[in-house]
């Protein structure tokens, strides 16, 4: 069972009002979202789900598809994560996939929308934020009016808390080093008392 992760967080998620600022030592409930820049491959070895961190919040991962819907799907990589996009056409529940994935905090898709559909799996866990880092690479022009982080200067600086309205001219990218503290997932951000 996977209990410690480095989870990506973009400043806009806080700026949209979906979460408050985060600080070291804080307890925070959230689901995990994943995305992949290239298609995931059908896994030849289907026995063990895993996530091995490469850098930032990117992982080499293998997992089992647990849920398919028309416009989102979920996988178990040792911990559940969802993708707010139509699933690949050839994928069914039980299919094992592997490849490089980004793991981030659920911006709002799960807790505001997906969790309200009757067959959605429970995906929100409680986490302790053990450390916070902020990306230090400057933005460079990628053409076509797009700015991206300079990959040759990628780096992280530890900070005690996020400040989404000020950090990096409101464009900060954070890395939350988290430890999962709840065993049983749920659908709501606030646990029933």
Positions of PLM-derived features:
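Short, structured beta-strand/loop micro-motifs enriched in basic residues and often containing a Trp
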Residues: 3-14, 76-82
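OB-fold and OB-like single-stranded nucleic-acid-recognition modules
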Residues: 9, 26, 30-34
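Short nucleic-acid-contacting surface segments enriched for D/E, G, S/T with interspersed K/R
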Residues: 15-29, 86-100
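Short, Lys/Arg- and Gly-enriched loop/turn segments at beta-strand edges
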Residues: 34-47, 105-115
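Structural detector for short beta-strands of small beta-barrel domains
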Residues: 49-71, 95-103, 118-168
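Short aromatic-glycine-enriched beta-strand elements
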Residues: 70-75, 171-176
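Short, surface-exposed beta-strand/loop "edge" segments at domain boundaries and coil↔beta transitions
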Residues: 80-86, 178-193
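Mixed-charge, glycine-accented linear interaction segment located at domain edges/termini
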Residues: 98-112, 116-117, 181-188
